[in-house]
């Protein structure tokens, strides 16, 4: 069934809580509904949203907003399946992956919760990321050393131009850091994700190399503490990265997907604002990737300013470049906790810009964004780029 509303209030459909309306809003329940939508006749522009967690509406939307309610989670029955090509991680020696088909309208954290309860590995580190499954495959969401591309097998879509259903393999999705083929300007908006097939595992595969995540998880299973501040000893507790430590130790059977999920949820709740209480889009900026020489200059300046023993948080990439957390740069520029009108930099996580008063204007958020970008550029010679889409 397709439900159409005009001049729909979108305040509760974007996590920033921007008080905007859409000229036309269409919500559909099934894959078959997409065939019945006359895309050529829709008011332009056309925007498909998920949970509205990565958007900043700058004004009322003068076109059509689409939203999926395709809601199912299903383990695919593939008896005798020997296809280990669904993900590079799997080989002939490793167990056959568990393929799970999930509707685009499923809340992503509901999928993570389901997987953990089923004892399936792969999605636990992505727990509590806001948004829906369809948008996760477009954005390539990630957290705590894992990106959604690490568990995607195939993405199924409706091609609004050719009016046909198509699928994209992992390789065809062209995933990069918070990027995919679906975000390329030449095809952005053409494909509507209907469902995603994930490749999970029944074999224990904990990814605990991020910051002090391993410490927090092991403390939890040992009954020492569930305190998320265990992870805060690392300056990149959320929104950054650390040099991963190899998981060479034997797997502790007490560590399950549910345990890791519980710890990560505690950490995220401690570090990030609850959208229902204080609007935000989560991480506002992407972490910049710079040359090794540029990083050395930043590190030298930091040691001169903060002491010779100071270590700039970073992650060395395979191609020789270095990823430095935007959160660290923003905090070093003095923005943590600063307000500008109704907008503010979150006092517990400088990577997050919040709708502090609940009625911030888009211009206030954009103004704060621009000032942060300018100050980071002036201090570090690095240009930050927003992760949030400006609509």
Predicted regions and their residues:
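Anion-binding (especially nucleotide phosphate/pyrophosphate-binding) glycine-rich loop
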Residues: 1-155, 159-162, 172
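Phosphate/pyrophosphate- and phosphate-bearing ligand-binding catalytic cores of soluble enzymes
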Residues: 5-7, 11-18, 55, 166-227, ...
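Short hydrophobic-aromatic micro-motifs
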Residues: 26, 56, 65-66, 100-102, ...
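Residue-level signal for inorganic ion chemistry
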Residues: 30, 52, 131, 163, ...
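A cross-taxon signal for low-complexity, glycine/charged-rich
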Residues: 80, 90-101, 219-254
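Beta-rich strand-turn-strand
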Residues: 120, 362-368
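Structural preference for long, well-ordered alpha-helical segments within the folded cores
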Residues: 368-371, 375
């Amino acid at each position: 069934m397709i439900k159409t509303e005009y001049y729909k209030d979108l305040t509760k459909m974007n996590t920033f809580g921007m008080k905007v309306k859409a000229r036309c809003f269409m919500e559909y329940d099934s894959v078959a509904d997409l065939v019945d939508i006359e895309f050529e006749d829709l008011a332009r522009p056309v925007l498909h949203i998920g949970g509205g967690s990565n958007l900043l509406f700058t004004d009322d939307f003068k076109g059509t907003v689409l939203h999926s309610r395709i809601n199912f989670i299903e383990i695919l029955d593939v008896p005798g399946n020997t296809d280990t090509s669904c993900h590079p991680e799997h080989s002939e020696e490793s167990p056959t992956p568990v393929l799970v088909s999930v509707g685009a309208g499923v809340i992503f954290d509901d999928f993570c919760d389901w997987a953990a309860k089923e004892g399936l590995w792969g999605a636990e580190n992505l727990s509590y990321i806001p948004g829906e499954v369809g948008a996760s495959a477009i954005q390539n969401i990630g957290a705590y050393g894992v990106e959604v591309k690490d568990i995607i097998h195939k993405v199924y879509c409706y091609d609004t131009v050719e009016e046909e259903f198509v699928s994209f393999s992992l390789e065809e999705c062209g995933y990069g850091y918070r990027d995919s083929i679906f975000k390329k300007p030449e095809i952005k908006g053409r494909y509507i994700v209907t469902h995603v097939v994930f490749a999970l595992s029944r074999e224990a595969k904990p990814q605990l190399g991020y910051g002090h995540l391993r410490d927090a998880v092991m403390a939890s299973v040992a009954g020492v503490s569930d305190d998320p501040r265990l992870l805060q000893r690392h300056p990149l507790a959320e929104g950054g990265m650390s040099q991963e430590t190899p998981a060479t130790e034997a797997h502790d059977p007490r560590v399950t997907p549910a345990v890791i999920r519980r710890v990560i949820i505690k950490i995220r709740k401690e570090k990030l604002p609850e959208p229902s209480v204080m609007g935000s889009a989560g991480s506002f900026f992407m972490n910049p990737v710079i040359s090794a020489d540029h990083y050395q200059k930043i590190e030298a300046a930091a040691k001169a300013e903060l002491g010779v023993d100071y270590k700039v948080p970073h992650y060395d990439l395979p191609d020789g470049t270095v990823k430095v957390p935007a959160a660290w740069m923003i905090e070093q520029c003095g923005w943590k906790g600063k307000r500008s009108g109704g907008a503010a930099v979150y006092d517990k996580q400088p990577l997050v810009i919040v709708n502090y008063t609940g009625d911030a204007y888009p211009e206030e958020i954009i103004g704060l964004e621009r000032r942060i970008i300018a100050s980071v550029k002036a201090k570090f010679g690095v240009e930050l780029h927003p992760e949030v889409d400006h609509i």
